[in-house]
């Protein structure tokens, strides 16, 4: 009874935060559909002006501030991804609490008069670990990701049903803020497989999103490869693009369809070892101004990027280009939530499209910035304190073989006698440090496409240790099946005047150091 009253109180508080018109719509439910060259909100033409925000990249205490920042820009909608791997970090164990409470985030959007577009994957890209797919899928070696692999599709359906439990009641038809739900994500950049995309659509519908408007996004160059007749088609492109050209083909095949840029890239992501990416504010503002003048809907990706906390940053391909923790994206609202000059230039332009209404005031930052004084670290513990498990094997095991998603592995083997100039070769994902008898020999860096290292001379029985750190899994393209650790066999090659000799050590000790907060605290206290 007490729980029921609490729920009723929260619901009433949410309704009271709305305008009278919004309150009536919330009580009765509404409609969002496609009309003749326009979207229709409750039967009236509506231009979607969406701000892309990702709830896991923003501390929950700041969610409402960021939403209000977007509203003060002149946005009427928030667009978000649902990240499968943050909600199901262990198979079958779902977490929609705390910073993962996507339903609470959507309710905050509604409280502040914003509609919501939900993009539940299963794949999301987003410069996020493995594009949002859980690492534990890789424990099934023959799995085919983003295809009609039976196990993959089974797990997708289970996840999407959990998303439905959280969000289906929040669609506009039920009085909630959700006006659109996306099916898959930019599949044209991955392949051509309409049966797979159709199956994902059916799963999304069965998860409770059977009445809300469904759409799929892609690039203008490939959207027809997987376009489903019953879905709305939207385009993704960035600043500086020729707007008319981006929608030319869509206009030819669907002349009466509404136009929407579902990702208008405000900036770009950063990778390790490169300069911070920036894009001119002028190009962004002019592109959005042109779209609004033509009645074209959009979602600004990103309006606020935030931070890929912990191990959640992904990596790009071809090659291996890990993303940094910051997801600032050169967005109008910077990583820590402050308005940039780009924000105010955009706000000035957006004020032309408010039907004469004054934009809300820009909210103050929820907390002031501080300067951390110089300090010295005086205590440390050996890395080996963090070891939580080990296994013997006749070849190196991957993280996934050891049931570990993220962290570091320590591989140890005994060497035969080797002469100076012998070469160690293997596939190391992602950064390997090599020691012989406890002495550091060198590193092998996947970022630099390194696969080998020269070894010093060593007597028979010497111990070789390889410490491998895993970085973010690739989140784009066919390389998303990205195992971590030492992948396959390791070889040691020597050459003399008579012959070349290549050998593979057959006895390995594999030890894991998981990337886990509790594990780190335990290691420090050991």
Language model segments and positions:
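N-terminal carbohydrate-binding accessory modules
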Residues: 24-77, 107
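Aromatic-lined substrate-binding rim segments of carbohydrate-active enzymes
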Residues: 63-129, 201-212
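Aromatic- and acidic-residue-enriched segments that line the glycan-binding/catalytic groove
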Residues: 92-100, 110-111, 122-147, 197-201, ...
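An active-site-proximal structural segment forming one wall of the substrate-binding cleft
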Residues: 98-118, 141-178
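Catalytic-core region of carbohydrate-active enzymes that cleave or remodel glycosidic bonds
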Residues: 114, 206-207, 211, 240-334, ...
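An acidic-aromatic loop/edge-strand motif
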Residues: 133, 137-140, 164, 173, ...
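Active-site neighborhood of glycoside hydrolase catalytic domains
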Residues: 151-229
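Aromatic-lined ligand-binding clefts that engage carbohydrates, nucleic acids, or primary amines
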Residues: 421-435, 526
């Amino acid at each position: 009874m007490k729980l029921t009253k609490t729920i009723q109180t929260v619901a009433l508080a949410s309704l009271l935060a709305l305008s009278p018109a919004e309150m009536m719509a919330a009580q009765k439910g509404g409609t969002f559909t496609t009309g003749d060259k326009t979207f229709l909100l409750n039967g009236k033409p509506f231009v979607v002006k969406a701000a892309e925000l990702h709830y896991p990249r923003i501390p929950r205490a700041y969610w409402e501030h960021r939403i209000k920042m977007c509203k003060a820009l002149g946005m009427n909608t928030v667009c978000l991804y649902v990240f499968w791997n943050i909600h199901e970090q262990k198979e079958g164990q779902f977490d929609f609490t705390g910073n993962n409470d996507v339903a609470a985030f959507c309710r905050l959007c509604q409280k502040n008069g914003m509609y919501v577009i939900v993009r539940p994957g299963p794949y999301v890209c987003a410069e996020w670990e493995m594009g949002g797919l859980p690492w534990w899928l890789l424990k099934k070696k023959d799995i085919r990701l983003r295809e009609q692999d039976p196990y993959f599709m089974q797990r997708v359906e289970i996840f999407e049903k959990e998303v439905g439990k959280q969000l289906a009641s929040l669609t506009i038809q039920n009085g909630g803020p959700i006006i659109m739900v996306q099916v898959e994500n930019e599949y044209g950049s991955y392949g051509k497989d309409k049966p797979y995309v159709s199956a994902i659509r059916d799963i999304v519908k069965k998860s409770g999103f059977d009445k809300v408007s469904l759409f799929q996004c892609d690039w203008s160059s490939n959207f027809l490869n997987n376009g489903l007749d019953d879905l709305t088609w939207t385009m993704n492109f960035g600043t500086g693009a020729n707007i008319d050209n981006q929608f030319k083909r869509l206009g030819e095949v669907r002349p009466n369809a509404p136009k929407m840029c579902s990702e208008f890239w405000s900036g770009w992501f950063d990778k390790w070892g490169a300069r911070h990416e920036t894009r001119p504010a002028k190009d962004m503002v002019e592109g959005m101004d042109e779209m609004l003048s033509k009645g074209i809907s959009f979602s600004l990706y990103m309006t606020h990027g935030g931070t890929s906390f912990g191990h959640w940053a992904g990596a790009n391909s071809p090659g291996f280009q890990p993303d940094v923790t910051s997801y600032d994206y050169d967005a109008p609202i910077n990583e820590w939530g402050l308005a940039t000059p780009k924000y105010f230039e955009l706000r000035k332009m957006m004020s032309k499209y408010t039907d004469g209404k004054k934009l809300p005031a820009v909210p103050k930052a929820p907390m002031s910035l501080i300067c951390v004084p110089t300090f010295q670290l005086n205590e440390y513990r050996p890395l080996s304190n963090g070891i939580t498990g080990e296994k013997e094997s006749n070849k190196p095991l991957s993280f996934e073989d050891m049931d570990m998603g993220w962290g570091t592995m320590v591989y140890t083997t005994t060497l035969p006698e080797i002469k100076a100039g012998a070469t160690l070769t293997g596939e190391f994902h992602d950064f390997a440090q090599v020691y012989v008898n406890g002495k550091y020999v060198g590193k092998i860096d996947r970022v630099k496409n390194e696969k080998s290292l020269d070894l010093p001379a060593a007597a028979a029985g010497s111990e070789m240790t390889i410490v491998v750190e895993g970085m973010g899994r690739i989140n784009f393209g066919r390389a998303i099946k990205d195992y971590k650790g030492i992948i396959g066999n390791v070889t040691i090659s020597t050459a003399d005047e008579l012959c070349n000799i290549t050998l593979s050590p057959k006895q390995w000790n594999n030890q894991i150091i998981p990337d886990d907060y509790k594990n780190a605290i335990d290691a420090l206290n050991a």
